Amino acid sequence: DATSEELAMIFSSAVKWSDVRADWPAEDILRFIPGTDSGTFDYFVEAIVAPAYPDAEGEDSVENGEAAILAAANLQMSEDDNVLVQGVVGSPYAIGFFGFAYYQANADKLTVLSVDGVAPTAESAEDNSYPISRPLFIYTTGKIMQEKPQVAAFVYFYLTNVNNEILDVGYFPASDEVLQGALDAWTAAVME
């Protein structure tokens, strides 16, 4: 288990595990993370690292957080999550982050990390209590859906079928409440 603050240190300023907690090994932290074009990278910086690197006004700074994580020692980046998994598996002093689907496919070799006392589970993802679970959205506008009925049809198909398929690709389903809200918004948008 680590706190959000410790996780920010692990992925930025700490060089050795013992820099984070004195009772952890005095071994270099080996970091394996997605590339900067990844939404997973962006979300991790925003949710975990940026709060540790505020701007001059004291606000969370994504820019400062990104600079801190990119300046970390022993950092390996890859757009291929399988490469990240193999890097973490390759050393007891390695840590990484990537989509839950890649953890599930390698659960026999990897250990998940509780953050702020919350384990990554379907329940903690759904109720947003796990600090680094993130929702995925699709976006359009009412105008586009009115001008292009095929877009409206696709969005409706997606919203009414997403939970039937999403588990197969390693994502957690959206709650009934979230889906109903999206369907209500879809209805309002196409009826404008």
What are these regions (language model features)?
Residues 1-192:
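Flexible loop/hinge segments at secondary-structure junctions
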